[in-house]
Swiss-Prot record:
GO MF annotation terms: metalloendopeptidase activity; RNA endonuclease activity; zinc ion binding
Enzyme Commission number(s) of this protein: 3.1.-.-
Native species: Shewanella frigidimarina (strain NCIMB 400)
A single GO BP: rRNA processing
Protein name per Swiss-Prot or TrEMBL: Endoribonuclease YbeY
Keywords for the protein's UniProt record, in alphabetical order: Cytoplasm, Endonuclease, Hydrolase, Metal-binding, Nuclease, Ribosome biogenesis, rRNA processing, Zinc
Localization per record: Cytoplasm
SUPFAM superfamilies: Metalloproteases ('zincins'), catalytic domain
Binding of Zn(2+), residues: H117, H121, H127
Encoding gene per record: ybeY
Main location: cytoplasm
GO CC terms in record: cytoplasm
Length: 156
Protein backbone atom coordinates (compact mmCIF):
# COMPACT_ATOMS: atom_id res chain seq x y z
CA UNK A 1 0.00 0.00 0.00
CA UNK A 2 1.41 3.39 -0.96
CA UNK A 3 0.99 6.53 1.09
CA UNK A 4 -1.62 7.62 -1.43
CA UNK A 5 -3.43 4.30 -0.82
CA UNK A 6 -4.13 5.33 2.76
CA UNK A 7 -7.71 6.43 3.31
CA UNK A 8 -7.27 9.61 5.35
CA UNK A 9 -10.08 11.61 6.91
CA UNK A 10 -8.40 14.72 8.32
CA UNK A 11 -10.52 17.20 10.25
CA UNK A 12 -8.48 20.41 10.13
CA UNK A 13 -9.71 22.98 12.67
CA UNK A 14 -8.28 26.49 12.47
CA UNK A 15 -8.86 28.33 15.76
CA UNK A 16 -6.34 31.10 15.16
CA UNK A 17 -6.19 34.03 12.75
CA UNK A 18 -3.01 33.37 10.81
CA UNK A 19 -2.62 33.80 7.05
CA UNK A 20 0.67 31.85 6.97
CA UNK A 21 -0.71 28.40 7.74
CA UNK A 22 -0.05 25.37 5.56
CA UNK A 23 -2.81 24.15 3.27
CA UNK A 24 -5.10 21.19 3.94
CA UNK A 25 -3.21 19.28 1.23
CA UNK A 26 0.14 19.95 2.94
CA UNK A 27 -1.19 18.73 6.29
CA UNK A 28 -2.51 15.59 4.58
CA UNK A 29 0.83 14.93 2.85
CA UNK A 30 2.69 15.17 6.16
CA UNK A 31 0.23 12.92 8.01
CA UNK A 32 0.42 10.34 5.21
CA UNK A 33 4.23 10.40 5.41
CA UNK A 34 4.13 9.74 9.16
CA UNK A 35 1.45 7.07 9.01
CA UNK A 36 3.26 5.27 6.19
CA UNK A 37 2.30 1.63 5.99
CA UNK A 38 0.95 1.34 9.54
CA UNK A 39 -2.78 1.80 8.95
CA UNK A 40 -4.89 1.57 5.77
CA UNK A 41 -7.69 3.82 7.11
CA UNK A 42 -7.02 6.78 9.39
CA UNK A 43 -9.15 9.49 10.94
CA UNK A 44 -7.63 12.30 12.96
CA UNK A 45 -8.13 15.91 13.92
CA UNK A 46 -5.51 18.63 13.74
CA UNK A 47 -6.48 21.79 15.60
CA UNK A 48 -4.39 24.92 15.06
CA UNK A 49 -4.56 27.15 18.13
CA UNK A 50 -3.23 30.34 19.69
CA UNK A 51 -0.96 30.77 22.71
CA UNK A 52 -3.80 30.89 25.26
CA UNK A 53 -5.44 27.64 24.15
CA UNK A 54 -2.11 25.82 23.90
CA UNK A 55 -1.10 26.99 27.37
CA UNK A 56 -4.45 25.98 28.87
CA UNK A 57 -4.33 22.49 27.33
CA UNK A 58 -0.66 22.00 28.23
CA UNK A 59 -1.41 23.01 31.82
CA UNK A 60 -4.48 20.77 32.07
CA UNK A 61 -3.04 17.64 30.46
CA UNK A 62 0.71 17.86 31.12
CA UNK A 63 0.92 20.07 34.20
CA UNK A 64 3.10 22.59 32.35
CA UNK A 65 1.76 26.15 32.53
CA UNK A 66 3.20 27.37 29.23
CA UNK A 67 2.31 27.02 25.56
CA UNK A 68 3.94 24.26 23.54
CA UNK A 69 4.41 23.50 19.85
CA UNK A 70 2.35 20.30 19.57
CA UNK A 71 0.18 18.22 21.86
CA UNK A 72 -0.89 14.70 20.93
CA UNK A 73 -4.01 13.01 22.21
CA UNK A 74 -4.11 9.39 21.02
CA UNK A 75 -7.51 7.73 20.77
CA UNK A 76 -7.61 4.78 23.13
CA UNK A 77 -10.36 2.28 22.40
CA UNK A 78 -10.93 -0.99 24.23
CA UNK A 79 -8.83 -3.79 22.66
CA UNK A 80 -11.88 -5.46 21.13
CA UNK A 81 -12.95 -2.28 19.31
CA UNK A 82 -11.35 -1.61 15.91
CA UNK A 83 -11.78 2.01 14.85
CA UNK A 84 -9.72 4.06 12.38
CA UNK A 85 -9.60 7.03 14.77
CA UNK A 86 -5.95 7.81 15.49
CA UNK A 87 -6.48 10.80 17.78
CA UNK A 88 -6.05 14.56 17.89
CA UNK A 89 -3.11 16.90 17.39
CA UNK A 90 -3.17 20.43 18.77
CA UNK A 91 -0.54 22.67 17.22
CA UNK A 92 0.17 26.21 18.40
CA UNK A 93 0.83 28.38 15.34
CA UNK A 94 2.65 31.21 17.17
CA UNK A 95 4.99 28.75 18.92
CA UNK A 96 5.77 26.96 15.64
CA UNK A 97 6.53 30.30 13.98
CA UNK A 98 8.74 31.48 16.85
CA UNK A 99 10.66 28.19 16.92
CA UNK A 100 11.24 28.35 13.16
CA UNK A 101 12.71 31.85 13.56
CA UNK A 102 14.85 30.88 16.58
CA UNK A 103 16.11 27.72 14.86
CA UNK A 104 16.67 29.49 11.53
CA UNK A 105 14.44 27.02 9.67
CA UNK A 106 11.95 27.60 6.87
CA UNK A 107 8.50 27.88 8.44
CA UNK A 108 7.00 25.25 6.12
CA UNK A 109 9.73 22.76 7.07
CA UNK A 110 9.04 23.28 10.78
CA UNK A 111 5.30 22.80 10.22
CA UNK A 112 6.03 19.52 8.42
CA UNK A 113 8.25 18.41 11.29
CA UNK A 114 5.65 19.25 13.95
CA UNK A 115 2.88 17.36 12.11
CA UNK A 116 5.13 14.34 11.63
CA UNK A 117 6.34 14.52 15.25
CA UNK A 118 2.79 14.69 16.59
CA UNK A 119 1.55 11.95 14.27
CA UNK A 120 4.32 9.63 15.45
CA UNK A 121 3.20 10.26 19.04
CA UNK A 122 -0.30 9.19 17.99
CA UNK A 123 1.24 5.97 16.67
CA UNK A 124 2.86 5.31 20.05
CA UNK A 125 6.36 6.73 19.58
CA UNK A 126 7.81 8.73 22.45
CA UNK A 127 10.99 10.51 23.48
CA UNK A 128 11.07 10.24 27.26
CA UNK A 129 13.70 7.47 27.36
CA UNK A 130 16.92 8.17 25.41
CA UNK A 131 16.70 4.95 23.39
CA UNK A 132 13.12 5.71 22.32
CA UNK A 133 14.05 9.33 21.63
CA UNK A 134 16.85 8.22 19.32
CA UNK A 135 14.47 5.92 17.42
CA UNK A 136 11.80 8.61 17.12
CA UNK A 137 14.25 11.33 16.04
CA UNK A 138 15.80 9.01 13.47
CA UNK A 139 12.39 8.23 11.98
CA UNK A 140 11.39 11.91 12.02
CA UNK A 141 14.61 12.84 10.23
CA UNK A 142 14.06 10.15 7.60
CA UNK A 143 10.46 11.26 6.98
CA UNK A 144 11.20 15.00 6.93
CA UNK A 145 14.17 14.54 4.60
CA UNK A 146 12.02 12.26 2.43
CA UNK A 147 9.72 15.23 1.91
CA UNK A 148 12.65 17.35 0.68
CA UNK A 149 13.35 19.29 3.88
CA UNK A 150 16.58 19.41 5.89
CA UNK A 151 17.22 17.27 8.95
CA UNK A 152 15.08 18.97 11.64
CA UNK A 153 17.64 18.20 14.35
CA UNK A 154 20.64 19.60 12.49
CA UNK A 155 22.05 22.71 14.12
CA UNK A 156 21.44 25.70 11.85
Amino acid sequence: MSQQGISLDLDLQIAVDNPRLPTQAEFETWVRAAIGQTKPVVELTIRIVDIAESQQLNSTYRGKDKPTNVLSFPFEAPPEVELPLLGDLVICAPVVEQEAIEQNKPLIAHWAHMVIHGSLHLLGYDHIIDEEADEMESLETQLVEGLGFDNPYKEA
